[in-house]
Amino acid sequence: VPLAALAPVPGLALYSASKFAVRGYSLVAGMELAEHGIAVTTICPDAVQTPMLDQQKDKEQAALTFSGARALIVQEVVDAILDNALKNKPLEIILPTMRGGIAKAANAFPTIAARQVGCSVNKK
């Protein structure tokens, strides 16, 4: 589930909404299944360098997707699963942590975030 599950992404309403739903379902499943010894970890990576990401690079509505320092590589997500999710079984892993924190803050303060996003997206 990408970082779009943590904060609304202007221009990608349906995509963002579907990711919010998957994250919510996964977190609840993890909570409910824990009593049965079943772990569910939701992995929320930032943009990952894949062919799907390449298709978005020229689309204006995807500007926030490319606002980070760099796209993650697939191996970074794999490492998070192998080194953290399978060993520690947290409910959620966010990659990278700093962008995840920013996304969560944007979700907590949507009016402020909307103003900031509007400014940063329009300043190309």
Segments predicted by a language model, with ranges:
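Alpha-helical segment proximal to the catalytic Tyr-Lys
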Residues: 31-35
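Residue(s) in the substrate-gating loop at a strand-loop-helix junction
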Residues: 2
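Short, flexible catalytic-loop segment of classical short-chain dehydrogenase/reductase
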Residues: 45-55, 59-63
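Active-site loop immediately N-terminal to the catalytic Tyr-X3-Lys motif
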Residues: 9-13
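Conserved catalytic-site region of short-chain dehydrogenase/reductase
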Residues: 5-7
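C-terminal helical subdomain
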Residues: 42, 64-100
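Rossmann-like NAD(H)/NADP(H) cofactor-binding core
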Residues: 36-41
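Active-site helix of classical SDR
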Residues: 18
